[in-house]
Amino acid sequence: MSHIEKQAGELQEKLIAVNRVSKTVKGGRIFSFTALTVVGDGNGRVGFGYGKAREVPAAIQKAMEKARRAMINVALNNGTLQHPVKGAHTGSRVFMQPASEGTGIIAGGAMRAVLEVAGVHNVLAKAYGSTNPINVVRATIAALEDMKSPEMVAAKRGKSVEEILGK
């Protein structure tokens, strides 16, 4: 159900899920739609958005706009992760680890969409617990945010990168 489109700013946009929700009022039910989207530049920047409106296109547009505003930077290492990372949000837990060149993105559903637009090309990933797309996306982005490059760790500790890597 996800599709990619390139935009003028070279952001990749992916629609992960559209859901019909209802509000019950005295006169019956009022239906509206929610949309979950992710955007990324394919080079370490990624964000997600959740939009809600009475019509599907309006919900998607709101979600895309929120995603563009909420982008984070991810420190990638040659198209893969720096080190194994875990992330969690409510009942969803995700585990991702770097993979060698040629492995591809081994991940399911919502997690795959986030990793693709972030610019990760080789990764092994698994979602545990709830696979609700919103929670999986939040957990994946939390894990990517927690990932630190050796340069960041070295700067924080006041050491050289070689000391951190044990070379």
Swiss-Prot record:
One MF term in the entry's GO annotations: rRNA binding
Domain annotation S5 DRBM: ranges: 11-74
One GO CC term, this protein: cytosolic small ribosomal subunit
Keywords of this entry: Ribonucleoprotein, Ribosomal protein, RNA-binding, rRNA-binding
Gene Ontology terms: biological process: translation
InterPro entries the record matches: Ribosomal_Su5_D2-typ_SF, Ribosomal_uS5, Ribosomal_uS5_bac-type, Ribosomal_uS5_C, Ribosomal_uS5_N, Ribosomal_uS5_N_CS, Ribsml_uS5_D2-typ_fold_subgr
Task performed by this protein: With S4 and S12 plays an important role in translational accuracy.
The record's note on its domains: The N-terminal domain interacts with the head of the 30S subunit; the C-terminal domain interacts with the body and contacts protein S4. The interaction surface between S4 and S5 is involved in control of translational fidelity.
Family from the record: Belongs to the universal ribosomal protein uS5 family.
Subunit annotation: Part of the 30S ribosomal subunit. Contacts proteins S4 and S8.
Name under which the protein is recorded: Small ribosomal subunit protein uS5
Biological classification of the source: Bacteria, Pseudomonadati, Pseudomonadota, Gammaproteobacteria, Enterobacterales
